[in-house]
Amino acid sequence: MKILVTGAKGFVGKNLCAQLNNIKEGKCVIPGLTGNLEAVYEYDIDSTVEDLDRYCSDCDFVFNLAGVNRPQTPEEFMQGNFGFASLLLDTLKKHGNTCPVMISSSIQATLAGRFGNSEYGRSKKAGEELMFEYGKETGAKVLVYRFPNLFGKWCRPNYNSAVATFCHNIANDLPIQVNDRSVEMELLYIDDLVDEMIAALQGNEHRCAYDGIDVVPVIAGSTSSVIAGSTGDLTGRYCYCPVTHKITLGEIVDLIYSFAEQPKTLMIPEIPENSFAKKLYSTYLSYLPKEKVSFPLKMNVDARGSFTELVHTLNCGQVSINISKPGITKGQHWHNTKWEFFIVVSGHGLIQQRRVGSDEILNFEVSGDKIEAVHMLPGYTHNIINLSDTENLVTVMYCNEIFNPQKPDTYFEPVE
């Protein structure tokens, strides 16, 4: 299978081509695609008409992501969006190539509500109709996607994405402007978009109709029941990405500022799987300047070694790193409710525990050569001893709560 991607150097194009090449090279295994993807043709503004002609002659699927969204004049919208689509389809027809063609449109093409006078929307709508006519004329499968606002890594800031601009500016300590924090946006994450493109490539696209600007999912075989009561085009001829997030500008900005504070607070925010916060955090990190990629941690150093907090969480405690010099014993205390994991990752040591009020000592010999986690039990006084005369003992320590100096829950008592 040979894939043509137009607009390959744009935001969506770069991400899609990267994943397609991962599949082609076997770095990402997609059943049915891995091993069958022969070439990814990347076409962009610096490519030639001859390149397009060659690619259209033997491609098996087209992702048309080329377009104009920031022209010098309104007329360039139609030239860049409708004009190139015409050239692409004419070139495919020249070679008798009726492979499936996907085109990226925009929610503005609905020309509904606030988009009623959008020149960009009109040009995208014209491109859509051209694509539908092409499908009728040639029998080729066409997939028209109306994308909402997009975000993710590699998106150009200060151009066409508020999220990209917010992430870039906050990461670089630059001011941002939010005129109305209550404005709600519908956002599509780039990885979710790419996942849908891969699904479309396999014939598993999600179909929909539109009721104004609202997506109406269409289920194969039950179209009438799904879209009953809607207005407008109800044929399900459009495609859509099923995973989007609706969130206000104020919420977006607050999240990004909380991410920016993480090196100071060590606090990892709540980032559930597939949540908007998880996707936004990854996006924010992609805009960090070099000088912020690494940051210092506060090392509490004394003659015995050091103790450094690494990560705090809102509800799941903290992770720290402890270094003990040769022959040193640390700990000799117990907790009522607090509990810990000690995980030696380098060196050779002994962990001892004794239940308060008992004489029995539990001994655990630990080593970086055989990494294991040892519970520090509530109500048991415990210590950790570096058995080496020459090497430091390095221990990762997880505690179920963040240290609170007002309520340390720590009581000195030697194990022996």
Language model: regions and residue ranges:
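Flexible, glycine-rich beta-alpha linker
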Residues: 110-111, 118-119, 145-164, 174
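Mid/C-terminal beta-alpha module of Rossmann-like enzyme folds, strongest
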Residues: 199-298
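Substrate-positioning beta->alpha
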Residues: 157-165, 182-202, 250, 254
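Conserved beta-loop-beta element that borders a ligand/cofactor-binding pocket
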Residues: 129-154, 174-183, 233
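NAD(P)H-binding glycine-rich loop region in Rossmannoid oxidoreductase-like domains
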Residues: 47-84, 91-93, 108-115
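N-terminal Rossmann NAD(P)H-binding glycine-rich loop of SDR-like oxidoreductase domains
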Residues: 3-22
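A conserved pocket-lining segment of Rossmann-fold NAD(P)-dependent short-chain dehydrogenase/reductase
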Residues: 148, 165-188, 200, 208, ...
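Conserved Rossmann-fold NAD(P)-dependent oxidoreductase catalytic core, especially the SDR/UDP-sugar
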Residues: 86-128, 135-138, 143
